[in-house]
């Protein structure tokens, strides 16, 4: 928080969410953009979080977040291990292909989904061959991961289309 205030000169607070009172903290009730970078998976009650984000955004405002992906190579190749090895404070794992259906219920329209967190070393073929990151096989798998959107994390950008 200190860095954001002193170096970037953005007003910021450390507060509980979704209980924050933005009128008290910032002097305004709605924003053009709300972001949550690797935060959303830590909320137990996603409904109250998405409801609050809708409340905080102006019409046509942008909600952008990143989170682990349940459609990445780790989840697809090692499903049991993926969930067992997920941190205990992760309460949701997003499937990018279903994001629009979920977010629509909370007044959002998905504008863009970006597959991130590409790790060729997590692909079974790379694990078996133990090839180096400079090998042709590695580079092909890395490209395939990006083309097929098999990153282990995802960024989702959506627009508020209606109030709840």
Stretches with model-predicted labels:
Residues 1-77, 93-105, 150-162:
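Conserved SAM-binding loop
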Residues 8-12, 81-84, 129-131:
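Short, hinge-like loop/turn segments at secondary-structure boundaries
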Residues 12-15, 84-86, 111-113:
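Short hydrophobic/aromatic-enriched beta-strand-loop microsegments
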Residues 73-80, 125-131:
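Short, flexible, mixed-charge acidic loops at enzyme active sites
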Residues 80-81, 118:
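Non-heme Fe(II)/2-oxoglutarate
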Residues 82-97:
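Acceptor-substrate binding/catalytic loop of class I
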Residues 108:
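Conserved acetyl-CoA-binding loop of GNAT-fold acetyltransferases
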Residues 111-164:
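A C-terminal cap/extension of S-adenosyl-L-methionine-dependent methyltransferases
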């Amino acid at each position: 928080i200190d860095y954001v205030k002193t170096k970037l000169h953005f007003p910021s607070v450390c507060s509980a969410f979704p209980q924050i009172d933005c009128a008290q903290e910032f002097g305004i009730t709605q924003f053009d953009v709300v972001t949550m970078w690797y935060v959303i998976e830590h909320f137990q009650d996603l409904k109250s979080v998405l409801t609050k984000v809708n409340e905080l955004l102006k019409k046509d405002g942008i909600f952008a977040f990143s989170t682990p992906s349940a459609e990445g190579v780790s989840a697809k190749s090692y499903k049991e291990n993926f969930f067992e090895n997920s941190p205990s404070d992760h309460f949701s794992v997003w499937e990018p292909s279903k994001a629009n259906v979920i977010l629509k219920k909370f007044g959002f329209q998905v504008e863009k989904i970006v597959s991130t967190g590409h790790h060729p070393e997590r692909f079974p073929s790379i694990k078996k061959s133990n090839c180096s990151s400079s090998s042709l096989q590695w580079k092909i798998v890395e490209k395939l991961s990006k083309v097929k959107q098999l990153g282990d994390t995802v960024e989702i950008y959506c627009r508020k289309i209606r109030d709840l």
